[in-house]
Design a protein with these regions (language model features):
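A short, basic N-terminal segment
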Residues: 1-47
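C-terminal alpha-helical "lid" subdomain
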Residues: 1-21, 63, 109, 189, ...
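Conserved NTP-binding/hydrolysis module of P-loop NTPases
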Residues: 12-20, 83, 87-110
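Walker A/P-loop nucleotide-binding motif
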Residues: 45-66
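Conserved catalytic segments around the Walker B and adjacent sensor/switch elements
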Residues: 73-87
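The catalytic "switch" region of P-loop NTPases
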Residues: 80, 132-134, 154-235
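Central P-loop NTPase core of STAND/AAA+ ATPases
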Residues: 102-128
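Conserved P-loop NTPase "ATPase switch" module shared by AAA+ and STAND
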Residues: 126-148, 152
């Protein structure tokens, strides 16, 4: 967290990295994240199956919210189905049926799975004929059981003539790649072969980190360069590069990690009496 000394040093009345996304203009977008957001939007609108994978704090939820905000802003006739089961490992086909019924109608879910299945198909068909699209969005999808993952294809196959009734968006962490590996889960190959996989990359360069911080400080009416210099951003990028035992260099510069390091650097600058967070301040941490 930012210390009081840092707040005073940089003339801040609130943490630039806490509660920092309240509207679409607060979202930092790269070419990659714009593409991913548009892909989610088009999947929800026109159909398909996609899995969005990214490390914790990489911005998956923010991108999902950005796509949903666009749907609302453009008044698209798209119904969002979001199962609320906390433990996604316990999410079953029956629970997904319940979510579809409750999010797409005013009916109560039927008791038996057979009755629920018929109810789901009827509700989605009638809604589709009324001009609506439907998208099933599941967060923390890396926790889904393989049997549930396998049966998602059955939901995706629901159709009215040539019209697909349900598109599917899964959002999870990189470990989900193992579940989407046909060699490890042969029984789920039907969905694995049909699902598009998108992965979020870190902000590897100092320039990207600078652009990200520009958005955070601009929201508070502050000039980023007076708080974190360009060479400070480059030093942050270097700090957030790691190396495997095999010598492969990779970056962990995801938004959540950048936020934490920027706070530490600002606290350090305040302690050292530095004018701003520059490379020397970053390298002293």
């Amino acid at each position: 967290m930012l210390k009081m000394k840092a707040y005073k040093k940089f003339g801040l009345s609130q943490d630039p990295f806490s509660g920092d996304v309240t509207k679409a203009s607060d979202v930092f977008m790269t070419d990659e994240t714009r593409f991913v957001s548009e892909f989610l939007y088009q999947t929800a609108k026109t159909g398909g199956m996609v899995a969005l994978l990214g490390e914790s704090g990489s911005g998956k939820t923010t991108i999902r919210r950005y796509a949903l905000e666009k749907i609302q802003r453009e008044k698209q006739k798209i119904k969002i189905i979001a199962p609320r089961t906390i433990d996604k490992a316990k999410l079953t086909t029956s629970a997904i049926c319940d979510a579809i019924v409750q999010d797409c109608s005013t009916e109560a879910p039927k008791r038996t799975l057979e009755a629920k299945s018929r109810q789901v198909e009827r509700i989605l068909t009638n809604s589709s004929r009324a001009g609506y699209s439907h998208v099933l969005m599941i967060e923390e999808a890396h926790d889904l059981s393989v049997p549930t993952l396998k049966y998602l294809k059955r939901f995706w196959e629901l159709e009215d003539g040539f019209t697909k009734l349900l598109s599917i968006v899964l959002i999870g962490q990189p470990e989900m790649k193992a579940k989407l590996d046909e060699s490890q889960n042969w029984g789920a190959r039907e969905i694995i072969r049909r699902i598009e996989v998108l992965e979020l990359s870190p902000l590897e360069s100092g320039k990207e980190i600078a652009s990200y911080l520009d958005v955070k400080f601009k929201r508070l009416g502050k000039d980023r360069k007076k708080i974190v210099t360009d060479d400070g951003c480059a030093a942050l990028a270097a700090k957030l590069r790691k190396q495997t035992r095999g010598g492969t260099v990779y970056s962990v510069a995801y938004p959540l990690v950048i936020n934490r390091w920027a706070r530490m650097a600002m606290n350090q600058a305040a302690e050292l009496g530095a004018d701003a967070v520059d490379a020397d301040v970053v390298n002293s941490i």
